[in-house]
């Protein structure tokens, strides 16, 4: 079996299992253990952080996929990875102090209609930074033709982690 067929099959299995676990999480575990208020809070935190994530990663995950095959020397490929990590890191190093300095103004402006989310602003920022770096490393795994592990981390691991946290939270 070829590498593409094998990885596609394994990715299909992991996505199917992740879908089932996600359905159990959404239909049973969230309402049972968190209630509708906290279920909405978790979904809102993830959605807002997913909106911020592209500004932090600045599209470097797409640049890795686009330009990796253009480089032939190992030093050039390593330089691409270094640059794709440094760009989000520089953005984070600029953005976090500005966010910290204007924290209360940002909270008032962004969360003027719903102040209950404002106390989770740091959580939103942390999730956005984490997902930005995850996307860069996931794209690196894809160009190295190791999509099964990256797909496992992207699809199955978060759902398993949420299920365990919800079960042990109760």
Predicted regions and their residues:
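Interhelical loop/hinge segments that connect adjacent transmembrane helices in multipass membrane
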Residues: 1-4, 116
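Transmembrane-helix boundary and interhelical linker motifs in polytopic inner-membrane proteins
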Residues: 2, 30, 34-36, 52-86, ...
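Signature of the first transmembrane helix
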Residues: 3-62, 100, 127
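Alpha-helical transmembrane segments of multi-pass membrane proteins
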Residues: 6, 10, 14, 48-49, ...
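Alpha-helical transmembrane segments and their helix-entry boundary regions
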Residues: 7, 11, 39, 80, ...
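Hydrophobic transmembrane helix module of multi-pass membrane transport proteins
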Residues: 17, 86-170
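Transmembrane alpha-helix boundary/hinge residues in polytopic small-molecule transporters
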Residues: 24, 63, 133-137
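Short, proline-centered helix/strand-breaking motifs
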Residues: 27, 47, 66, 155-160
């Amino acid at each position: 079996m070829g590498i593409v067929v094998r990885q596609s099959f394994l990715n299909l299995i992991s996505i199917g299992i992740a879908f089932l676990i996600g359905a159990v999480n959404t239909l049973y575990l969230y309402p049972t253990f968190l209630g509708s208020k906290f279920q909405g809070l978790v979904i809102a935190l993830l959605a807002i952080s997913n909106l911020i994530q592209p500004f932090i990663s600045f599209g470097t995950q797409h640049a890795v996929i686009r330009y990796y095959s253009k480089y032939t020397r190992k030093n050039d490929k390593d330089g691409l990875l270094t640059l794709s990590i440094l760009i989000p890191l520089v953005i984070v190093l600029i953005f976090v102090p500005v966010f910290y300095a204007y924290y209360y103004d940002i909270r008032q402006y962004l969360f003027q209609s719903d102040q209950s989310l404002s106390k989770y602003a740091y959580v939103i920022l942390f999730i956005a930074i984490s997902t930005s770096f995850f996307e860069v490393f996931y794209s690196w795994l894809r160009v190295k033709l190791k999509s099964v592990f990256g797909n496992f981390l992207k699809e199955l691991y978060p759902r398993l982690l949420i299920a365990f946290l919800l079960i042990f939270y109760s």
